[in-house]
């Protein structure tokens, strides 16, 4: 009993306010009090009022709210509700919401302290947890876009998504406006150049968007250089393929007269400076047919050497795997005629485009993040500390992935229109790539060690990924230590165990065979797993997303398709190169989509900078503050390093890393 001060915060996005009336109740350990009709929430506003409660409530557990309407349901986006009392000396309790309130049902918001099942011995929150998860499992159902692929949220369109997973209006308007602009520019360029005959590589300037990326302009000017070709395996938009050679690849057969090359490769191998990029995953993938014209896919192997100055230079390129009973395929060398060597590198870059966009970016970034998001919503109630830790890193992931499945990789989507693996090959590639989703490959300390990239001073991706992983790991450990005092408390958390199992066994289709845990047996194992989840949704995605505009804007550096088969001889002319690279329309659409998806997003939340406060109490806030301080220190270190580099690496710079897979 006594006077309570109540504050209610409404979101700032368009349509966040409501004309409907909201009714509130306070629920404590010893009683419940109705506060009456008190407010019509206004967008971006915080409403405060005081109310005298006659009942003795004890410690507050919930705020219940109900929105009532007479004519139409006007959804309300509630940020949080704060209650202080009884009296001026009473405690303040924060009740996080950060969701849409629709209909006229009663919504219960638990106080913001993170609590596991073990933390609730009296069962004060037991019913709420069970009812919330039961409702969530109806809303968040597993779906299967294509047989053989990891699972996704059920639903074919954005309207099938739970409302809380959809873009807020400001994000939706920006995304759709950029798409409209890109398609309009594409239509204009198509109409102006429909009869244009492409004769030289400089003709690609006609569809190149100057002023969008300084780095892209440098790529256009330097893309033919071997040093830049090798650099992209270390620090480009797909740093996930390169590995240090421990033996010469079995597929590397030497045609007659290649003894000197073999000796050079053996020498680099013995010195530990031989690296390889193997695209065997593309072997046998069905190539697209675009407007009745056959396209082509290759499965190259690139052998590279790391020089003392840190440059990674190509030594040989094999464009296709050898076949039993046939002569070894040709090996293309830097000493070949310039056009021959350039075309071989273009084939590698086109193959890298396919593996990057489908395997490294879509599958390992977007789709795995979606598995984490769906499992989190199905298994962890909003009061659970791991839900509170993870939820800022899952924002918008389900909608952006549905947009990808209905626009990019759908039937008649962008891949079918202009990409050589479209028309079904892209689905086959995703199915194959699932076998390579190993747990260790999602954890940079393990992945970089496995690929032999630790200690490579010119691999700025490796350096920044390790730093970011360590910072995330300390952040996760800080939160975990507040809520799990022993390994036994981890093992006894049935919600946590169900979440882990849902990710590994259900969403990832039995990934325990690939090293993913089915149960979490210790605090250390929990920290490692949660760090992996957050890194996947932040740094891992950003490292394969942010570079698209820089490296794919100049189409010859990353051709979306190839219109002639890979060369089998070395008599290559400029005419053959131009006939192989994408035509005008294909190149224009690649440029348009690259701009839309690769541009710096005007509406984004940088890593760790989310405004939502899901935790109550000073301890979690102190952990988050420390996390932000460490991110700021990393930001400064990267800034200082990049100032000394000819080609700055920024794709893991914390201010550019998005807090979730949202684009």
Swiss-Prot record:
Catalysed reactions, semicolon-separated: (5Z,8Z,11Z,14Z)-eicosatetraenoate + O2 = (12S)-hydroperoxy-(5Z,8Z,10E,14Z)-eicosatetraenoate; (5Z,8Z,11Z,14Z)-eicosatetraenoate + O2 = (15S)-hydroperoxy-(5Z,8Z,11Z,13E)-eicosatetraenoate; (9Z,12Z)-octadecadienoate + O2 = (13S)-hydroperoxy-(9Z,11E)-octadecadienoate; (5Z,8Z,11Z,14Z)-eicosatetraenoate + 2 O2 = (14R,15S)-dihydroperoxy-(5Z,8Z,10E,12E)-eicosatetraenoate
GO MF terms, alphabetically ordered: arachidonate 12(S)-lipoxygenase activity; arachidonate 15-lipoxygenase activity; iron ion binding; linoleate 13S-lipoxygenase activity; phosphatidylinositol-4,5-bisphosphate binding
Top-rank taxon, per record: Eukaryota
Lipoxygenase domain segment(s): 116-663
One GO cellular component, as annotated: cytoplasmic side of plasma membrane
UniProt-listed PROSITE patterns: LIPOXYGENASE_1, LIPOXYGENASE_2, LIPOXYGENASE_3, PLAT
Xref: SUPFAM superfamilies: Lipase/lipooxygenase domain (PLAT/LH2 domain) (SSF49723), Lipoxigenase (SSF48484)
Subunit structure: Interacts with PEBP1; in response to IL13/interleukin-13, prevents the interaction of PEBP1 with RAF1 to activate the ERK signaling cascade.
Protein name, as recorded: Polyunsaturated fatty acid lipoxygenase ALOX15
Cofactor: Fe cation
Gene3D superfamilies (UniProt xref): 3.10.450.60, Lipoxygenase-1, Domain 5 (1.20.245.10), PLAT/LH2 domain (2.60.60.20)
Enzyme class: oxidoreductase
A single GO BP: wound healing
Domain PLAT: 2-115
Tissue distribution of the protein: Detected in tracheal epithelium.
Localization in the cell: Cytoplasm, Cytosol; Cell membrane; Lipid droplet
Pathway linked to the protein: Lipid metabolism; hydroperoxy eicosatetraenoic acid biosynthesis
Family: Belongs to the lipoxygenase family.
């Amino acid at each position: 009993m006594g006077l309570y001060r109540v504050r209610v915060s409404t979101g700032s996005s368009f349509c966040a306010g409501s004309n409907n009336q909201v009714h509130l109740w306070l629920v404590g350990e010893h009683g419940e009090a109705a506060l009456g009709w008190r407010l019509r929430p206004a967008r971006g506003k915080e409403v405060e009022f005081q109310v005298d409660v006659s009942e003795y409530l004890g410690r507050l557990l919930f705020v219940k709210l109900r929105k009532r309407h007479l004519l139409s349901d006007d959804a309300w986006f509630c940020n949080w509700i704060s209650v202080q009392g009884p009296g001026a000396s009473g405690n303040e309790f924060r009740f996080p919401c950060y969701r849409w309130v629709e209909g006229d049902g009663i919504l219960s918001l638990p106080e913001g302290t993170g609590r596991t099942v073990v933390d609730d011995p009296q069962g004060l929150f037991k019913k709420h947890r069970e009812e919330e998860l039961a409702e969530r499992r109806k809303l968040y159902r597993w779906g299967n876009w294509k047989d053989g692929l990891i699972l996704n949220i059920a639903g074919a369109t954005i309207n099938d998504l739970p409302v809380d997973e959809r873009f807020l209006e400001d994000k939706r308007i920006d995304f759709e406006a950029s798409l409209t602009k890109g398609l309009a520019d594409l239509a204009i360029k198509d109409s102006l150049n429909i009869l244009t005959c492409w004769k030289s590589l400089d003709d690609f300037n006609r569809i190149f968007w100057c002023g969008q990326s300084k780095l892209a302009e440098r790529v256009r000017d330097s893309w033919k250089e071997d040093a830049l070709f090798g650099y992209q395996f270390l620090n480009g938009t797909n740093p996930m393929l390169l590995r240090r050679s421990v033996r010469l690849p079995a597929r590397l057969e030497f045609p007659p007269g290649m003894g000197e090359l073999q000796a050079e490769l053996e020498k680099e191998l013995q010195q530990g400076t031989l690296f390889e990029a193997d695209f065997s995953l593309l072997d046998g993938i069905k190539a697209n047919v675009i407007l009745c014209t056959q396209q082509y896919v290759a499965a190259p192997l690139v052998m590279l050497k790391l020089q003392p100055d840190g440059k990674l230079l190509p030594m040989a390129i094999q464009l296709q795997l050898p076949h039993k009973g046939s002569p070894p395929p040709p090996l293309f060398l830097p000493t070949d005629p310039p056009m021959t060597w350039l075309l071989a590198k273009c084939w590698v870059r086109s193959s890298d485009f396919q593996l990057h966009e489908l395997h490294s970016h879509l599958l390992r970034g977007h789709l795995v993040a979606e598995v984490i998001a769906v499992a989190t919503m199905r298994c962890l109630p909003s009061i659970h500390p791991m839900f509170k830790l993870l939820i800022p890193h899952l924002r918008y992931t389900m909608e952006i992935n549905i947009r990808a499945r209905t626009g990019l990789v759908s039937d008649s989507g962008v891949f079918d229109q202009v990409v050589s693996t479209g028309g079904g090959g892209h689905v086959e590639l995703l199915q194959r790539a699932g076998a390579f989703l190993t747990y260790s490959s999602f954890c940079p300390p393990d992945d970089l060690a496995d690929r032999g990239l630790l200690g490579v001073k010119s691999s700025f991706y490796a350096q920044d990924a390790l730093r970011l992983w360590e910072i995330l790991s300390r952040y996760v450990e800080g939160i975990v230590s507040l809520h799990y005092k022993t390994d036994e408390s981890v093992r006894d958390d049935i919600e946590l165990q169900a979440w882990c199992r849902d990710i590994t066994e259900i969403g990832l289709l039995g990934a325990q065979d690939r090293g993913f845990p089915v149960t979490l047996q210790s605090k250390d194992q929990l920290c490692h797993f949660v760090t992996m989840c957050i890194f996947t949704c932040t740094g891992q995605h950003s490292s394969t997303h942010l570079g698209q505009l820089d490296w794919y804007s100049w189409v010859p550096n990353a051709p979306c398709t190839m219109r002639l088969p890979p060369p089998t001889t070395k008599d290559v002319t400029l005419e053959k190169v131009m006939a192989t690279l994408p035509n005008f329309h294909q190149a224009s659409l690649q440029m348009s989509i690259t701009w839309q998806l690769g541009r710096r997003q005007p509406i984004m939340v940088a890593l760790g900078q989310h405004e939502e406060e899901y935790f109550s109490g000073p301890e979690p806030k102190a952990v988050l503050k420390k996390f932000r301080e460490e991110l700021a220190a990393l930001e400064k270190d990267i800034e200082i390093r990049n100032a000394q580099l000819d080609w700055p690496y920024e794709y893991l710079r914390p201010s550019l890393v998005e807090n979730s897979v949202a684009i």
